[in-house]
């Protein structure tokens, strides 16, 4: 685990060793309107099978708070770009809680505070490899899986994703929106 960039050899090896079954991604964007708030909590659960003892998830963010692998908390091994996972089984479930940053460059989750109307706007741009700026993932286009997104946001915000809304819960000045699972897609399309 030494670089934010992936080599062709690394991606080929990881594709042979790991098969992703699903992603469940929770984004807490309730603090987005506060210009002094640089980031947000992202919680990702990935189900995958593996033929190797170790692999890594891609993530570019200020901090990884916790990693739970197959029901057990494991030490966080994060080098600023990769979250190391070892002791893998044939079938695995990993949950990563991390802090991601809002972008002002259009990479990842871009936040724009509009001076004309005083409102906050967010949008994502993940091509070619910037989903990892928002949630922990296997950031390779050949490693497709279904995604379920759950977004907590200020009440009154329009929250959109690749699928229709499955559930919406109002929580006073906030809302939580759960979207139906996607078909298997690459991370950069989410």
Q: Predicted regions span which residues?
A:
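Acidic/His-enriched low-complexity segments
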Residues: 1-190
